[in-house]
Design a protein with these regions (language model features):
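Helix-turn-helix
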Residues: 32, 40-74, 78-79
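Generic hydrophobic, amphipathic alpha-helix propensity
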Residues: 29-38, 54, 79-83, 87, ...
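Amphipathic alpha-helical segments used for helix-helix packing
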Residues: 104, 118-141, 191-198
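Amphipathic alpha-helical linker/stalk segments
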Residues: 79-108, 138, 144
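Short coil/turn segments at alpha/beta junctions that flank glycine-rich nucleotide-binding fingerprints
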Residues: 43-47, 119, 164
Length: 225
C-alpha cells in the first residue's frame, strides 16, 4: 500500500435496491460485516479494499452490505467508530473515579499500553486514516463525542490529584492524553521499522513489560514534577 494509492479513493456507488436481509439478527449481521471490514481495510487500505471481498468472507452479498451501510466509505467510517468506541467503552469500565489519583493514572496507562499492544488493527486503521488527513473522522460526530470522555475522565483525576497535593497544578488533560497515547501508539505503529533499524524485538515479553513500566513511571514523574 502506497500513500499515493491511499489518497486516490474513488467512492463506490451504492446499489439502489438491496434485497431484504434473510438474517434474523440484524445487529449480529452488522457486527459480522464490521469485523470482516476491519480485516479488509487493514490489509488493503481504504482505496484497495473491496466490498466484494468482505462479502465473500462472510458468505453474503455485496448488496447486503450496501443495505446495512450504504457505501464502502460509510462502512469505513463505522469501522472507525467501532474501533474508537471499543477503547473508550473499555476505559469507562476501569472505574478510575473510584481509585486514588496516582493509582488511577497508573491503571489508565497500563490499560492504554495493553490495548494498543493487543489491538494492532486499531493502530493500523488510525494510520490509514492519518494518510487521509482525518477526512473520514471529520464526517463522524460520534468519534469526537466518544473521545471527549477520556479528557473528562483525565481532567477529574488530575483535579483530585491537585487537591490532594500529589500532582502539579498546571496540567492539561489533553497534554497528558497525548503523552500516554504517543508512546503506546508509536511502539506498535513503528514496531517493524524501529525493530529492524535498532535490532530490537519489541513484541518480546520482557521488553514489553519493561516499556510498560517505563511509560507508567514517565507519566507519573511528569505529573508530579
Amino acid at each position: 500500500m502506497t500513500i499515493i494509492s491511499e489518497l486516490s479513493v474513488a467512492p463506490e456507488k451504492p446499489i439502489a435496491e438491496p434485497r431484504k436481509s434473510r438474517k434474523n439478527n440484524p445487529e449480529k449481521t452488522r457486527e459480522n460485516i464490521l469485523q470482516e471490514a476491519i480485516v479488509e481495510f487493514v490489509q488493503q487500505g481504504l482505496s484497495g479494499a473491496r466490498v466484494d471481498a468482505i462479502a465473500e468472507r462472510i458468505h453474503t452479498s455485496k448488496r447486503m452490505i450496501y443495505y446495512y451501510f450504504g457505501s464502502k466509505e460509510q462502512l469505513y467510517v463505522e469501522v472507525l467508530e467501532k474501533l474508537y468506541g471499543d477503547i473508550r467503552s473499555t476505559e469507562n469500565r476501569l472505574h478510575l473515579a473510584e481509585l486514588a489519583p496516582v493509582e488511577a493514572i497508573r491503571r489508565l496507562v497500563e490499560f492504554t499500553f495493553d490495548h494498543h499492544d493487543r489491538n494492532v488493527d486499531f493502530v493500523r486503521i488510525v494510520c490509514i486514516e492519518n494518510i487521509h488527513n482525518a477526512e473520514y473522522v471529520k464526517r463522524s460526530d460520534a468519534i469526537k463525542a466518544m473521545n471527549n470522555t477520556i479528557l473528562d475522565s483525565l481532567g477529574e483525576i488530575l483535579r483530585r490529584g491537585c487537591e490532594e497535593g500529589v500532582f502539579r497544578t498546571d496540567l492539561d488533560p489533553l497534554d497528558v492524553h497525548l503523552l500516554i497515547s504517543s508512546f503506546c501508539f508509536y511502539r506498535v505503529s513503528n514496531r517493524h521499522t524501529f525493530g529492524e533499524i535498532f535490532q530490537i524485538d519489541l513484541p518480546d515479553e520482557s521488553i514489553k513489560q519493561r516499556h510498560r513500566a517505563m511509560i507508567c513511571e514517565s507519566v507519573l514523574r511528569y505529573l508530579q514534577a
